[in-house]
A protein has these predicted regions:
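Glycine-enriched alpha-helix->loop->beta-strand junction motifs that scaffold or abut catalytic
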Residues: 43, 66-69, 86-93, 114-117
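Conserved anion-binding
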Residues: 100-147
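Hydrophobic faces of well-ordered beta-strands that scaffold small-molecule active sites
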Residues: 16-22, 45-49, 71-75, 93-95, ...
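Alpha-helix-loop-beta-strand connector modules within alpha/beta enzyme cores
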Residues: 54-75, 107-121
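Short, acidic/polar
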Residues: 26-38, 77-83, 145
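Glycine-rich, proline-tolerant flexible connector loops at the mouths of alpha/beta enzymes
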Residues: 23, 28, 40-66, 94-103
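N-terminal amphipathic alpha-helix/helix-capping segment at the start of soluble metabolic enzymes
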Residues: 1-21, 26, 114
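Hydrophobic, well-structured modules enriched for small/aliphatic residues and gly/pro motifs
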Residues: 72-85, 92-109
Length: 147
């Protein structure tokens, strides 16, 4: 069986880890840590946090440092934020290659993930697919996502 280690949590074995996502801005470190600690107490294993801008990436480091459970950085649009999140010590990154930008940008994120030995979740959705591919494949989103 294939497994993926996210911090101290192993995904892919008999136990199914519970993950949730914070709704508050990560720059509110005190609230973030309060919620993370409470979520851990009721059984949450992994927390996902949106990193929408540079300021969030800056505060993410402190949240990761103090969190009792692994942190996943959810990145949209800016590949540099993914790199900053990895450098901040997150335990996993979620990216959507459809909105990160060019193949070169995706490669830079992947290279950084490899360097830090951090797993990635590739999350693709129809909303981020390029219009020219939608037309080329007659809106067959599965074929488009594979390309």
């Amino acid at each position: 069986m294939n497994t993926v280690k996210v911090g101290s949590v192993i995904i892919g074995e008999d136990y199914i880890p519970i993950q949730t996502m914070l709704k508050n801005p990560v720059k509110d470190v005190e609230t973030s840590l309060y919620k993370i600690n409470n979520l851990q107490k009721i059984g949450c294993d992994i927390i996902r946090i949106t990193v929408p801008d540079e300021e969030s990436a800056f505060y993410l480091k402190e949240v990761v440092k103090q969190s009792p459970i692994p942190i996943v950085a959810d990145i949209h649009f800016d590949y540099k934020l993914a790199i900053k999140a990895i450098e901040a010590g997150v335990h996993k990154v979620r990216i959507n290659p459809g909105n990160i930008g060019s193949e070169e940008r995706v490669k830079r994120v992947i290279d950084c993930l490899k360097e830090y030995q951090i797993p990635v979740r590739i999350g693709i959705n129809g909303g981020s697919l390029p219009a020219h591919l939608k037309e080329k494949y007659n809106f067959d989103t599965i074929k488009i996502m594979v390309e």
